């Protein structure tokens, strides 16, 4: 949204704060001449694709085990501020391009994608504040009225938990709800029942994973799906028609020497594809993320041929919110959806460009958090603004996850009768 009257950026600041894992991250603040301002906090991933934009860390072992972000903070105040202060906050592309040009690298390793993204998002928030409208309305205009179906990560494995489950996330999606408020209640009720089931069977040895899901001691990935079905039914819901399943396999994490190592064995790509097809035939799985290694393009073609017409196949490590990687996927006919993580690409403008590219080629988009999160709720507004119809922001506990859900509840209330829950208009996961 542009205004004829410019909103001149007067001052940019940044500071080192903590994320949900107790690790440092960056918070950026953009203040306009009018006094309006925006603050944004940048998330961080545990399972990261090798093609992601560069997250700048200090590398000083005496501070935060080398994970400090004081370099990124200094880059905001010393290198970004001089090229952005004086620009119009309403011209998001100009602000982002100024930072990209100042960085001068393909992956933002000079300034750090975390430094650039903080300023990019804070600029949009300041612009929205200048107009005294919500961020979702500023970014999406009058059509920003679609509430996303949540992918609720209730069982954690892989890199997100210390247990013997290979797949990284097992999720529930309340596709049959009438409203987002109802969907959230359904998810919370299933999550509560799931906890009881796991405790009764003495399958819990600790608390929850990075994203708020349980990290139980299970014998296989299939056991996780069985327990989810049981929890859904015990909570009084119908698996599939009311609450569907989704998985983030994060296959790059257990790909070694051309083989996929899971369930205690080593398997060929075709065997792994067949295994996933078997799971889809046995369970109401509507979405699979990162089902194969991020560079195993030939196998991705096979997976898409096998499951692409019946299941949403999401590229995360495969595409890393990058329009170049997405375009390659489109050209090769690989996957049919993309996970959108702001810090994988590093600016709001490039994120919106990637979503637009996906939409033009009938690829679905899923707005996503990271495993290291903050109380920042930008992705909730972004999901509504872009009408993508899906959001992935963790489980039904841990306040950095719940903050996004609560923001969506407030947005739904603000929209009133104009609010539409995505599955009601066919904007949930693509599946048959």
Swiss-Prot record:
Species this chain originates from? Synechocystis sp. (strain ATCC 27184 / PCC 6803 / Kazusa)
Q: How is the cofactor bound?
A: Binds a second Mg(2+) ion via substrate during catalysis.
Q: Where is the active site?
A: 211 (proton donor), 341 (proton acceptor)
Q: Name one GO cellular component term.
A: cell surface
Q: What is its main location?
A: cytoplasm
Q: What is this protein called?
A: Enolase
The cellular location(s) given in this protein's UniProt record come to: Cytoplasm; Secreted; Cell surface
The EC number of this protein is 4.2.1.11
Pathway-wise, it operates in:
Carbohydrate degradation; glycolysis; pyruvate from D-glyceraldehyde 3-phosphate: step 4/5
Where is coiled-coil annotated?
none
InterPro entries, sorted: Enolase (IPR000941), Enolase-like_C_sf (IPR036849), Enolase-like_N (IPR029017), Enolase_C (IPR020810), Enolase_CS (IPR020809), Enolase_N (IPR020811)
Annotated region (Disordered), positions in chain:
41-64
Give the PROSITE patterns listed for this entry.
Answer: ENOLASE
């Amino acid at each position: 949204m542009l205004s004829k009257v410019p909103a001149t950026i007067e001052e940019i600041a940044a500071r080192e704060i903590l994320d949900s894992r107790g690790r440092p991250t960056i918070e950026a603040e953009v203040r306009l001449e009018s006094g309006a301002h925006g603050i944004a906090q940048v998330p961080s991933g545990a399972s990261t694709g090798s093609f992601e934009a560069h997250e700048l860390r200090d590398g000083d072992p005496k501070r935060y085990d080398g994970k400090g972000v004081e370099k990124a903070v200094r880059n905001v105040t010393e290198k970004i501020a001089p090229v952005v202060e004086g620009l119009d906050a309403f011209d998001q592309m100009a602000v982002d391009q100024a930072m990209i040009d100042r960085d001068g690298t393909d992956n933002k390793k000079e300034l750090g994608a975390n430094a650039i993204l903080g300023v990019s998002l804070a600029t949009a928030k300041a612009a929205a504040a200048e107009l005294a409208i919500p961020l979702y309305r500023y970014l999406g205009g009058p059509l920003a009225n679609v509430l996303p179906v949540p992918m609720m990560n209730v069982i954690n494995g892989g890199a997100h938990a210390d247990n013997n489950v290979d797949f990284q996330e097992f999720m529930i999606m309340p596709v049959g709800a009438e409203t987002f408020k109802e969907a959230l209640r359904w998810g919370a009720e299933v999550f509560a029942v799931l906890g009881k089931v796991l405790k009764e069977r003495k399958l819990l040895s600790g608390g929850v994973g990075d994203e708020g899901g349980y990290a139980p001691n299970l014998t296989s990935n299939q056991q996780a799906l069985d327990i989810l079905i049981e929890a859904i039914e015990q909570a009084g819901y119908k698996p599939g028609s009311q609450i569907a399943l989704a998985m983030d396999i994060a296959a790059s994490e257990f790909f070694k020497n051309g083989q996929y190592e899971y369930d205690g064995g080593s398997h060929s790509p075709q065997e792994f594809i067949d295994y996933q097809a078997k799971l889809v035939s046995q369970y109401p799985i509507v979405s699979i993320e990162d089902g194969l290694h991020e560079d195993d393009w030939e196998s991705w073609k096979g997976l898409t041929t096998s499951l692409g017409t019946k299941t949403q196949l999401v590229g995360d490590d495969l595409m890393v919110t990058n329009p170049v990687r997405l375009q390659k996927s489109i050209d090769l006919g690989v996957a049919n959806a993309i996970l959108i993580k702001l810090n994988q690409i590093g600016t709001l403008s490039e994120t919106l460009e990637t979503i637009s590219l996906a939409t033009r080629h009938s690829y679905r988009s899923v707005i996503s958090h990271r495993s290291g999160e903050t109380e920042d709720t930008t992705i909730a507004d972004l999901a509504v603004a872009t009408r993508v119809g899906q959001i992935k922001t963790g489980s039904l506990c841990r306040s950095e996850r719940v903050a996004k859900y609560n923001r969506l509840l407030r947005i739904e209330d603000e929209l009133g009768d104009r609010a539409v829950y995505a599955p009601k208009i066919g904007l949930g996961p693509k599946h048959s």
